[in-house]
């Protein structure tokens, strides 16, 4: 354990305990989740209802993945392994921590591949500790069918479930989970700076554009980890036809990942003058690239980058996928969708955006309003706070268990 991790652990243990102690268990503590966790901590402290401690993997410096530290964060590295060839993971030693310190409630990632999701609810219940699952519910990974088979039995193990969107809530209700036991915390990233600090972000975006020699070009931007599920290859396959729509069109692909060098090499072979693959960029430059692009496009495994794109009021095109992350984009209302893998559909969406700027502007204005007023960090925090308060009250018998 590093000195920084020791400080984090000690600080969390010595935090004020006027209220209930609520533990949140995550595979890794990511920097982009800190605004949510900060908000939950502030809600709990505001009336002395609870304090949080967040457990998960940190980086080599003892900081959250992507940077940042908090007094409520405690290091708990995740271990990876396989069962019958299926990737799984677990938190070594967490059961003993639970027995030794006995929190008042536990919030944990709800994923069938996490081994302790099958055992911790039983252990916690034997100790009188309510357990909340925090889950996307739906997955687009190639092994998602395994989760789908296990879901009905899996989610009934938890006292309550926090989900990322309405589609997840509907899926759980169809599986027999009581609607009253589900809390919809619409998944988002911190977009507040887009509405309060847009000039600074946009200025940085223009610097990036100029530095890449793209001033005056129409930018088609894709941000997403470079793995097969993100389907960057679809963009490369469609590129000759996309460029035919507008000779001034350039494609920028931002992020790192296992397929980075492969994608970079293919882009170089297809059109090195018009396709830029940046690799991973410094914190904040993802926002800056989105601020300066003309169209955002996300061909697969849609994630939180679309929230940034919608908040900036950029025309945003996604593959038509199930799931909470993508549900905020409604075709023709807040963005554009095409059938996943359908290159003709992708190209048609890009052409529609370019050919009808007035209609595109109306769609983008609705999306920006949605992100400013509804899909917010504050609303996400509020739902998580509500779920935690229900769990804590189970200790006093105010709310029934399943």
Q: Which residue ranges define each predicted feature?
A:
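Donor nucleotide-sugar binding/catalytic pocket of nucleotide-sugar-dependent glycosyltransferases
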Residues: 156-206, 214-215, 277-278
